[in-house]
Amino acid sequence: MALTSSSQAETWSLHPRASTASLPLGPQEQEAGGSPGASGGLPLEKVKRPMNAFMVWSSVQRRQMAQQNPKMHNSEISKRLGAQWKLLGDEEKRPFVEEAKRLRARHLRDYPDYKYRPRRKSKNSSTGSVPFSQEGGGLACGGSHWGPGYTTTQGSRGFGYQPPNYSTAYLPGSYTSSHCRPEAPLPCTFPQSDPRLQGELRPSFSPYLSPDSSTPYNTSLAGAPMPVTHL
């Protein structure tokens, strides 16, 4: 009898029973074993929020939909799962709601000091972008935007048609801040001693004025210089 008992002990030691850690766990056991409270000692910043009813339901549905549609994007899967969740009734949602309550109670028990703090996304300040006011400064009065090497051919090409007597002083090549505001045209005067100019101007106004008219225009035709306006 002693020999048989020793042989059974040796056989038992050679073939130990499978440990519980190697056995497949259900979803609840996996969640419990993988919870931060079971591992212990995690800071509160790394603790995740407890799942709600939709997350409990979609954790299985998402995996199935991803297997059926491997090329579907994750955002599209979430959109379809949200539409399906809205179509479910209260009776169908009840087991997932109860499971979410159980997870919330255990999360509160494991982390009594936990408080949800949403992380703010850091806004990257874009450097190198020139403000519009600085860029448009050269366009306002034609300052350094055109540059000194801007020729008259480029100016005529940019401004369209250029008349033959177009002054090159107003082209962008020499366009400075002093030309931002146009100056008033100077009145043109003719010499009083030239009888040809007076003779050409008088007949043009004679049909419109009577000989007996005492308007100030008659006095201007007598010999005073008359400004020429723009036609």
UniProtKB/Swiss-Prot annotation:
Cellular localization per UniProt: Nucleus
InterPro entries assigned to the protein according to its UniProt record, in alphabetical order: HMG_box_dom (IPR009071), HMG_box_dom_sf (IPR036910), SRY-related_HMG-box_TF-like (IPR050140)
GO molecular function: chromatin binding; DNA binding; DNA-binding transcription factor activity, RNA polymerase II-specific; RNA polymerase II cis-regulatory region sequence-specific DNA binding
One GO CC annotation: nucleus
DNA bind region: 47-115
Region Interaction with FHL3: start-end pairs: 136-181
Ranges of biased composition (kind: Polar residues): 1-11, 211-221
GO biological process: cell differentiation; myoblast development; negative regulation of striated muscle tissue development; negative regulation of transcription by RNA polymerase II; positive regulation of G0 to G1 transition; positive regulation of myoblast proliferation; positive regulation of satellite cell activation involved in skeletal muscle regeneration; positive regulation of transcription by RNA polymerase II
Keywords: Activator, DNA-binding, Nucleus, Phosphoprotein, Repressor, Transcription, Transcription regulation
Chain intervals for the UniProt region annotation (Required to promote HAND1 transcriptional activator activity): 1-45
Tissue specificity annotation: Expressed in myoblasts (at protein level). Expressed in embryonic stem cells (at protein level). Expressed in myogenic progenitor cells (at protein level). Expressed in the ovary. Expressed in kidney, liver, skeletal muscle, and testes. Expressed in lung and skin. Expressed in the brain, heart, diaphragm, and intestines. Expressed in the conceptus tissues of the placenta.
Superkingdom: Eukaryota
Keyword DNA-binding: yes
Residues found modified as Phosphoserine: S35
Main subcellular localisation: nucleus
Effect of a null allele: Knockout mice are viable, morphologically normal and fertile. Reduced regeneration of damaged skeletal muscle fibers following injury with increased numbers of mononuclear cells and a significant reduction in the number of myofibers. Impaired proliferation of myogenic progenitor cells, reduced number of satellite cells within the tibialis anterior muscles, and a decrease in FOXK1 expression.
Region: Disordered, residue numbers: 1-45, 111-136, 186-231
Record-linked Pfam families: HMG_box
Subunit structure, interactors included: Interacts with HAND1; the interaction enhances HAND1-induced differentiation of trophoblast giant cells. Interacts with POU5F1 (OCT3/4); binds synergistically with POU5F1 to DNA. Interacts with FHL3; the interaction recruits the transcriptional coactivator FHL3 to the FOXK1 promoter.
PANTHER family: PROTEIN SOX-15, SOX TRANSCRIPTION FACTOR
Function description: Transcription factor that binds to DNA at the 5'-AACAATG-3' consensus sequence. Acts as a transcriptional activator and repressor. Binds synergistically with POU5F1 (OCT3/4) to gene promoters. Binds to the FOXK1 promoter and recruits FHL3, resulting in transcriptional activation of FOXK1 which leads to myoblast proliferation. Acts as an inhibitor of myoblast differentiation via transcriptional repression which leads to down-regulation of the muscle-specific genes MYOD and MYOG. Involved in trophoblast giant cell differentiation via enhancement of HAND1 transcriptional activity.
The protein's name in its UniProt record: Transcription factor SOX-15
Organism whose genome encodes this protein: Mus musculus (Mouse)
Lineage: Eukaryota, Metazoa, Chordata, Craniata, Vertebrata
Gene this protein is translated from: Sox15
